[in-house]
């Protein structure tokens, strides 16, 4: 397994829909193993293939549900269903804050549906589905968003959208080709401290 560099916000691979996986699952095993390893070393709860520069509809996750139980898995060609997504300003108390390995070290309140279900193939090529509420639902929406070419900062509203744009510009994350490598570069989220 190899830890791969994580692509930062300005790269086009993050802003275009990924390609549906059509190759045999056996040809994806190294990629999926690398995705799990990269996510783990980055202390992430999810990672989409395009976040490591690969335009394929695959994401991995290791995320807690509302009771704190960890759920780990992989979805290939996922389909997302959700409850209604709120159109109001998200809470400013930290409960709606979301971060992203491709927007390193930053977090912004993000409105998400409270329930989500994902259906797709697992890393063995078997069809499966999982549903969750709260943080797990947020994780599923975030990762499928990546595969659809949507970074979570694209979904922000009001002052959070304006602040995210300023932050992205101030960090120079509008250009393609920028990356950070977990375990090599300083952890932008402060997990090393």
Swiss-Prot record:
Binds 1 Fe(2+) ion. InterPro entries: Peptide_deformylase, Peptide_deformylase_sf. Keywords: Hydrolase, Iron, Metal-binding, Protein biosynthesis. Its EC number is 3.5.1.88. CDD domains: Pep_deformylase. Transmembrane segments: none annotated. The keyword Iron applies. It holds the Pfam family Pep_deformylase. GO terms for molecular function: metal ion binding; peptide deformylase activity. It comes from the Bacteria. The active site is at residue 143. Fe cation binds at residues 100, 142, 146. Its cofactor is Fe(2+). One of its GO terms (biological process) is translation. It catalyses: N-terminal N-formyl-L-methionyl-[peptide] + H2O = N-terminal L-methionyl-[peptide] + formate. Belongs to the polypeptide deformylase family. HAMAP family: Pep_deformylase. Removes the formyl group from the N-terminal Met of newly synthesized proteins. Requires at least a dipeptide for an efficient rate of reaction. N-terminal L-methionine is a prerequisite for activity but the enzyme has broad specificity at other positions. This is Peptide deformylase 2. It comes from Corynebacterium efficiens (strain DSM 44549 / YS-314 / AJ 12310 / JCM 11189 / NBRC 100395). The lineage of its organism: Bacteria, Bacillati, Actinomycetota, Actinomycetes, Mycobacteriales.
């Amino acid at each position: 397994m190899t830890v791969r560099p994580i692509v930062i916000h300005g790269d086009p691979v993050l802003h275009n829909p990924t390609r549906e996986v059509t190759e045999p699952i056996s040809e994806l095993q190294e990629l999926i193993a690398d995705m799990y390893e990269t996510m783990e070393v980055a202390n992430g709860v999810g990672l989409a293939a395009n976040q490591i520069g690969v335009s394929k509809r695959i994401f991995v996750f290791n995320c807690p549900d509302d009771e704190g139980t960890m759920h780990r898995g992989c979805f290939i060609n996922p389909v997302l269903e959700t409850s209604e997504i709120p159109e109001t300003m998200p809470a400013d108390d930290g409960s709606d804050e979301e971060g992203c390995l491709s927007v390193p070290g930053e977090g912004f309140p993000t409105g998400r549906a409270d329930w989500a279900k994902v259906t797709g193939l697992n890393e063995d090529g078997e069809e499966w589905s999982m549903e969750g509420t709260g943080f797990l639902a947020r994780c599923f929406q975030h990762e499928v968003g990546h595969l659809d070419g949507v970074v979570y900062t694209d979904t922000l509203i009001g002052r959070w959208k304006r602040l995210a744009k300023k932050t992205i510009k101030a960090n120079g994350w509008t250009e393609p080709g920028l990356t950070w490598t977990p375990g090599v570069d300083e952890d932008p989220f402060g997990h090393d401290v």
